[in-house]
Amino acid sequence: MLRGEIRLVDLESALAGAADKRRPAVIVSNDRANTVAARLGRGVVTVVPVTSNTARVFPFQVLLTADEVGIRSDSKAQAEQVRAVSVDRIGPVIGRLPARLVAQLDEALRLHLQL
């Protein structure tokens, strides 16, 4: 499990207004923590949900083109929906952000969290 991977993640049990169901999400927690959680089979990783609704892309979101990240359709990463999820909810890799988009997502997270 590596930072920048797009994986299918079970986001069920989300409250109204939050991204829910099984959907793509970008792993944004650090690789060291991700490796430990994966090895132990427990713990949490931090993810940013992805949606294919790209009608509007706000400054705290990042446009992900299908060709560039390896997913089925153009989408956006929603930094405003960042959350920690159990490793039990993490599914297979379906894409990967190049370094340029990881940097943009880092900036979107900084903007959203006012860091």
Locations of regions flagged by a protein language model:
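Conserved functional hotspots at enzyme active or ligand-binding sites that engage polyanionic ligands
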Residues: 1-115
